[in-house]
Amino acid sequence: MKNFEFHNRVIHDVTEKLKELDIDLFLIITSEGSDKMTRFIPGVDTVGSGAFFFTKEGKRYGVASAIDAQDVEESGLFDEVIRYQDYDSTVAGLLKKLNPKRVALDFSETDTECDGLTLGRYEYYKAHIKGQLEFLEVSSDLFIPQVKAVNHQ
């Protein structure tokens, strides 16, 4: 089994940056490993659609298909792993529950390491939460480069 100590430390460092920058949530949206950020944080890959939620309070949530959920659970990195029947409503429901005001997503105009969210995945995600929530989206390039530097990546 893979050792997740490094990834646990990375998640801790990300949480500290979220607090420092007053960003409520870092949300990674992926499908079939499309976002290379998942190799760094959380360090768990998915075959199906997946989402990883990291709050500034230190809560960690994984949303995974039945096929992927076991790996996400066995990593020991998450407070809760939600197996979805309907990915879109599960992600939207968790966003509503968390009710963030500022959300960091993995997009960037200047840092390719922070630009793993595809336009198609982004538009699909936005279409499924439209009218349900309002929050400011910011780039993960506000903190990921510093976290990578501290963790020698």
Model regions and ranges:
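N-terminal accessory/capping or targeting/presequence segment of soluble
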Residues: 1-93
